[in-house]
Amino acid sequence: LLPKLKLDYPNLNLNIIEAQTDVLLNKISSGEIELAIMALPFNTNGFNVHKFWTEDFYWISRKNDPRSKKPSIKAKEIDLDELIMLEEGNCLKDHILDACKIKNTSKITFNASTLSTAIELVKGDIGTTFVPEMAVNQLLVANPELKETKLDEKGPHREIAIISRNNYAGDRDIKSLIDLFTEQLNSNQKIKVG
């Protein structure tokens, strides 16, 4: 996505910040940044929300896990004590818990600070994890010993949106970004590995 963005918009001044959602919203409010790409649901009252993508979650396990042979898996089929989640405060964790309808997290014993750490733990046969659909292809190409299984719970499990201040004047810029992102995400989805 970034090479295409740079190619199509060579004069674009791009400042990429990876942060938790509430930090990004504060930066938008203060004018430190103009836009953010975020996963929803999240409380975005007081901001312009431009939704452009929906996706589901996939359960990631080693290929030798018998459950990975199925085309989909229900949340109740996954042992919480084997589930590797991201640390508290990460919206991906909140979205996964919500999609799986998990209220009591006391049995979840593995917490990783990043998704790449969670994947390394799965590769080491420590447990299993979930990833968003947009990450599946790249993940499986890099880790052929892993297998994705679609989470069979009502979806879509999350939405992706561009968030801006209410007084942001660049609606045409947002439309151009949405078109570019959607094109790239759609082309990525056509390349199925598993």
Residue ranges and their predicted role:
Residues 1-45, 112:
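Central regulatory/effector-binding core of bacterial HTH transcription factors
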Residues 20, 74, 113-114, 132:
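Short loop/turn segments at beta->alpha junctions
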Residues 28-29, 78, 120-127, 162:
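Hydrophobic residues within well-ordered alpha-helices
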Residues 40-46, 94, 116-146, 154:
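A ligand-binding cleft/hinge motif common to bilobed small-molecule-binding domains
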Residues 40-41, 63, 133-135, 160, ...:
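Short secondary-structure boundary segments
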Residues 46-83:
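Flexible hinge/capping segments at coil-to-helix
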Residues 67-68, 82-103, 170-179, 188-194:
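Secondary-structure junction motif
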Residues 148-189:
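A late-sequence structural motif
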